[in-house]
């Protein structure tokens, strides 16, 4: 079978795109992939340019347009072509109505998302187009770095009480406890000049921990940390959600499921 040709509409130069860049690199081993990141172009013009380069896509993969197209280019006229098209949606809690409109107006055939239960709860109208594409790790980064386990308890990332109530609870309960370390999200601002953990440094910091706490936000879905932490050979203590069983997470075997009431006792045990 000839290799498929996939046109990806995404702004890969964004720092937050590290995971997706790694995904595209892996995809490129199985298909011919071209990235388009220029804003405000007509799809017909793009296709003519690519045809001149002897590339005619079999499929167009559109990255999430949310946050004012911060991660994807504005491309016009997608609904006027008959090439199969898919869109990848991540933060489903934002711009929900716009997401439905985008699929409808651009005649999107498939909608990919890393969450299943949350997708069905949030965008039930699109369930027939839904394809589950869970988060994945680059094994060259998220692995056992064989570092000394000198952090007893680690919490990383955002901890706003409105969006991350469990992380906020952990932070309040564990702050001041010997062996507990908390690092803010790298994009929350850094006026104090603290060390920022991204890529390998992030994975290595996880690898130093014996126990890592996280949750799936107030919306209860598996964020990337559910995949990154076990890959770094660190015990994950986390809130459960409906996607985990299908993803292969087994309480007591490859992670420890907790509640607001028992996470501290489980960690101490």
Predicted ranges, named:
Residues 2-55, 62-80, 84-251:
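Nucleotide-sugar donor-binding catalytic core of glycosyltransferases
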Residues 214, 258-259:
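Small/polar loops that bind or transfer phosphate-bearing groups
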Residues 252-258:
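A short acidic/histidine/glycine-rich donor-binding loop in glycosyltransferase catalytic cores
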Residues 259-269:
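C-terminal "capping" alpha-helix adjacent to the active site of nucleotide-linked donor transferases
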């Amino acid at each position: 079978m000839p290799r498929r040709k996939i046109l990806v509409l995404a702004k890969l130069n964004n720092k937050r795109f590290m995971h997706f860049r790694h995904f595209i690199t892996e995809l490129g081993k199985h298909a011919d992939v071209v990235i388009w990141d220029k804003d405000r172009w007509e799809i017909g013009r793009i296709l003519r340019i690519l045809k001149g380069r002897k590339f005619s896509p079999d499929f167009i993969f559109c990255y999430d347009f949310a946050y004012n197209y911060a991660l994807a280019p504005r491309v016009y006229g997608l609904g006027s072509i008959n090439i199969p098209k898919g869109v990848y949606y991540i933060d489903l809690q934002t711009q929900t109505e716009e997401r439905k409109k985008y699929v409808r107006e651009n005649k999107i055939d498939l909608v990919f998302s890393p969450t299943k239960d949350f997708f069905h709860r949030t965008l039930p109208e699109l369930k027939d187009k839904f394809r589950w594409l869970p988060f994945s790790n680059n094994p060259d980064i998220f692995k056992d770095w064989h570092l000394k386990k000198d952090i007893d308890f680690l919490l990383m990332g955002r901890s706003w009480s409105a969006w991350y109530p469990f992380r906020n609870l952990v932070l309040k309960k564990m702050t001041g406890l010997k062996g507990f370390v908390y690092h803010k999200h790298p994009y929350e601002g850094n006026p104090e000049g603290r060390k920022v953990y991204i890529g390998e440094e992030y994975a290595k910091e996880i690898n130093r921990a014996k126990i890592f706490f996280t949750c799936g936000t107030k919306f209860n879905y598996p964020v990337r940390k559910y995949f990154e932490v076990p890959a770094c050979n660190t015990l994950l203590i986390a809130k459960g959600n409906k996607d985990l069983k299908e993803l292969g997470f087994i309480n007591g075997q490859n992670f420890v499921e907790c509640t607001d009431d028992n996470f501290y006792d489980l960690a101490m045990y």
